[in-house]
Design a protein with these regions (language model features):
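Transmembrane alpha-helices and immediately adjacent membrane-cytoplasm interface residues
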Residues: 36-67
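Membrane-proximal, non-transmembrane interface segments of integral membrane proteins
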Residues: 66-155
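"A position-specific structural signal for the A-helix of alpha-solenoid helical repeats
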Residues: 62, 93-100, 136-140, 144, ...
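Alpha-helical repeat scaffolds
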Residues: 76-84, 112-122, 148-163, 190-204, ...
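Solenoid-like repeat scaffolds
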Residues: 47-53, 82-91, 119-129, 157-170, ...
C-alpha cells in the first residue's frame, strides 16, 4: 500500500539520506571501522524501510476505519476513491481497493456501480483467492438487491471452489464468507441453519461494520428458527449501529415487520 502515499516514501528517502550522511561522518570524522559502519548503515536502512512501510499501512488502515469503524461509506469513498489512480499497475493493490469501494457503494444502495467496480478487478498472481473474494462480494450484493437467484448462482460457484480447494488457496476468510452467505441465503428462504455457530460469530469481537452485519445474520436466522424474541434483540442491535449501512437499514425493516406482526396478534 506504500504506493498510495508518495509523501511517506519521500520522508523515508530523506531519513535514508540522513542515515547515509551520519554513516559517512562516523567513518571519516570519528574513524569508525568500515565494516562496523556498513553494518550500522544496513541496520538503520532496514529500520527506516520498516518504519516507512508501517506508516503507509497505518494510514491505509485509518482510511479503512472510516468505513469499518465510523460506518460512513460516503465519506470513505470521497477519501479512498481518489487513491485508486495511484495504484498504477499493481494488481493486488487495485483488487483490494476495488473490493472495498464496491462494498461502500453497495451500502449506499448504488448496486450497479458496486458491480461495475468488481468487473474492473485485474488478474492477479493468487487468482483462485481473488476469484473467490469477488464471487463472495458479488453474491452479497445480489442478496442486498434481493436478486436471490443471481446470489444463489454466485454462491453455488463459490461453494464448488471451496470443495475443490485442496491447498487452502482460497484462504480461511473466503471459506467462512461462503458459509455465512449460505446461512444468509437459507434464512431468506425461511430455513435456519448453523444457529449455534452464527451466535458464536455474532458474539465475537468485530469492528462495528462487521458486527452490524453479523447481528443482522443472527436476527435473520433466529427469525427463520421462529425465535422472535431472540431475533428482535439481535435486529435491535444491528439497527442501532448506524443508518448508513445496508445491514442496519435491513435490520430496521425486519424489526418494523416484527413489531407490526406483534401488534396484529395483540
Amino acid at each position: 500500500m506504500i504506493v498510495l502515499y508518495p509523501f511517506v516514501v519521500v520522508v523515508g528517502l530523506l531519513c535514508e539520506a540522513a542515515v547515509l550522511v551520519l554513516g559517512s561522518m562516523l567513518h571519516t570524522t570519528l574513524g569508525l571501522n568500515l565494516g562496523i559502519t556498513v553494518a550500522i548503515l544496513a541496520v538503520a536502512t532496514l529500520i527506516t524501510f520498516a518504519g516507512t512501510m508501517l506508516s503507509a499501512t497505518g494510514m491505509h488502515q485509518k482510511q479503512l476505519n472510516i468505513l469499518l469503524r465510523d460506518m460512513d461509506p460516503e465519506r470513505f469513498i470521497s477519501v479512498y476513491e481518489p487513491l485508486l489512480k495511484k495504484a498504477g499497475k499493481r494488481p493486488n493493490v487495485q483488487l483490494t481497493m476495488l473490493a472495498y469501494l464496491s462494498t461502500a457503494y453497495a451500502n449506499l444502495g448504488q448496486y450497479e456501480k458496486a458491480l461495475e467496480l468488481l468487473d474492473e478487478a485485474p488478474s492477479v498472481k493468487e487468482q483462485v483467492r481473488a476469484d473467490g473474494l469477488l464471487l463472495g462480494n458479488r453474491c452479497l450484493i445480489y442478496i442486498q438487491m434481493n436478486q436471490l437467484d443471481k446470489a444463489a448462482d454466485c454462491l453455488t460457484r463459490l461453494e464448488a471452489m471451496v470443495k475443490a480447494d485442496k491447498t487452502n488457496a482460497l484462504g480461511g476468510d473466503v471459506v467462512q464468507s461462503a458459509r455465512c452467505l449460505r446461512i444468509r441465503l437459507n434464512a431468506s428462504k425461511g430455513w435456519a441453519t448453523d444457529v449455534a455457530w452464527v451466535k458464536a460469530v455474532a458474539a465475537s469481537g468485530q469492528p462495528p461494520f462487521y458486527a452490524a452485519s453479523n447481528q443482522l445474520m443472527l436476527g435473520q436466522v433466529l427469525l427463520a428458527d421462529h425465535n422472535k424474541a431472540g431475533a428482535k434483540a439481535s435486529l435491535e442491535k444491528a439497527a442501532g449501529y448506524s443508518t448508513n449501512l445496508w445491514a442496519c437499514r435491513r435490520a430496521a425493516e425486519l424489526l418494523a415487520g416484527l413489531e407490526a406482526s406483534a401488534s396484529k396478534e395483540a
